[in-house]
Structures are given as C-alpha cells and as structure tokens.
C-alpha cells in the first residue's frame, strides 16, 4: 500500500492540488510507526493522524490494527517505550510534521482498570495529557460519544498538574 500511494499517480495528484492552493496540507493516517516514519521521511506529508497512548507506545509495531486490542498482547509485560514510536515522534518534531492523535484512550481500555494493561485506570485528563505531551502532537481527537464524555475531555483545559499526572498509572509497569 505504501508504494501504491507514494510512488504512483495519487501522490502526484495530491502534490498538484497543494501547489495549486486547493489544499493546504497533505496528511496520512496510520497505526504502524514503521510505515508512518517512512511516510514522514518522504518529506511529503504535513500532518500525521496516529494512535498515541501509553498502552500502544509500549507495544511492538504491527500492520494489523486489530492486534492492538488482542488479549494476548495485553497479557504480556512491556517494559520499555517502543523505539519505533519514539523515533517517529522525534522525526515529526524535527520535520515540523504535526501529529493529530487518535485512540488516546486506547478504545476506552485505558479508562477501565480491568481492561488496562497497567491494571489501573487512567482518567480522561491523564490520557489526554499523556498524548498532548508527546513530541510533535498538535491535537487530540478524544472520540467523545456523549455530553458527559465531552465535559470529561474539556476538564483537561482547567486541570491542575496533579490531576494531569499519569505517573501513578505507569508506575505499575515492571522495570527492566
């Protein structure tokens, strides 16, 4: 898929639209840090929609997004930040590629202790702060379904540093 997009007619068409002023930015959506990094390295994209949360940031990269939610993945102990994700975030920051975050709550799993790989629930404010403090992150799409969920997400705007602090959740990760 990567070569079909970046080596074909599609990218040429998109570049023409940008040059003509019909679009302002070229973006890409991905769940895989290796593919996303490769796209950023082309120098063609301006914005990357990417899944950012502490759960996914510790998992190995994969083409299959469904594996991010697999029980066997959550049952494993991950001890380190995924180096591919770290390299992607740093590259985006250096190149001025904005990251628009999706899946900040890991599909809701991070908000429930029994589903979180950390064994402890994060608050929406903590999950949003985690995402917003990664390099190159410009925005987070919280994925709210109800008015109450919107209020919980907006609470980040007035939250204290103590309310934003997610260290107590990540402290449950075993050390190397």
Stretches found by the model and what they are:
Residues 1-176:
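Beta/alpha (TIM)-barrel catalytic core signal, keyed to glycine-rich beta->alpha loops juxtaposed to Asp/Glu
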């Amino acid at each position: 898929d990567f070569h079909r997009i970046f080596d074909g007619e599609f990218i040429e068409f998109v570049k023409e639209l940008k040059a003509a002023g019909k679009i302002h930015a070229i973006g890409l959506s991905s769940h895989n840090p290796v593919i996303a990094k490769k796209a950023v390295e082309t120098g063609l994209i301006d914005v990357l929609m990417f899944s950012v949360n502490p759960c996914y940031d510790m998992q190995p990269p994969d083409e299959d997004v469904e594996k991010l939610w697999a029980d066997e993945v959550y049952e494993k102990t991950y001890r380190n930040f995924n180096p591919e994700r770290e390299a992607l975030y740093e590259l985006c920051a250096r190149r001025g590629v904005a990251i628009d975050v999706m899946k900040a709550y890991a599909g809701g799993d991070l908000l429930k202790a029994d589903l979180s790989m950390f064994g402890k629930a994060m608050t929406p404010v903590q999950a949003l702060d985690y995402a917003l403090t990664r390099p190159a992150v410009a925005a987070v799409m919280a994925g709210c379904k109800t008015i109450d969920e919107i209020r919980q997400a907006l609470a980040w705007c007035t939250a204290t540093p103590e309310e934003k602090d997610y260290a107590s959740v990540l402290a449950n990760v075993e050390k190397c």
